[in-house]
Structure formats: structure tokens, C-alpha cells
Amino acid sequence: MHPDLSPHLHTDECNQLITLLKQCHKEHNVLKFFGTCNDMDRAMRECLRKEYQTKRERSKAHAEEMRRRLKEQPKEHP
């Protein structure tokens, strides 16, 4: 099962691989069940995995920055 393959959610590189996989599935209606498109599927999944890891790292860095900024703010209590 793949994540949402909408183009606005992915990089150009992954979108190109997604398009190639969909095209392969259209061209090989029956052979896709026998592994004809598996290489493209693996490449697409690897690209999506890298994209996911990048997003996780960026989110983690952002969260750490937010925590640091919250700790540095002076506490203003009346």
C-alpha cells in the first residue's frame, strides 16, 4: 500500500517515478500482476522513503528549535 500519490505532496523526482509506474500499469494490464512493473515500484517506494525521512528530519529540527525558543523566553509572571 502506498501513501497518497497526489502530485502536490511529493518532489518532482518522486512525481516522475509515480507517473512512470502508472504508465507501466496502463500499458501492461495483465503483466503488472507478474512483476513487469516491480522495478519502477521499488524505485518509487525508495524515493518516497527518502522523502519521508527528509520530512521527519526537518520536522524534528523545527521542533527542537521551537523548544529552544520557548526555553529562552523570559518568564513574565505578575
Curated annotation (Swiss-Prot):
Keywords: Disulfide bond, Mitochondrion. Residues 52-78 are annotated as: Disordered. A motif (Cx9C motif 2) lies at residues 37-47. Residues 11-55 form the CHCH domain. One of its GO terms (cellular component) is mitochondrion. The keyword Disulfide bond applies. Pfam families: Cmc1. A motif (Cx9C motif 1) lies at residues 14-24. May be involved in cytochrome c oxidase biogenesis. Belongs to the CMC family. This is COX assembly mitochondrial protein 2 homolog. The gene is cmc2.
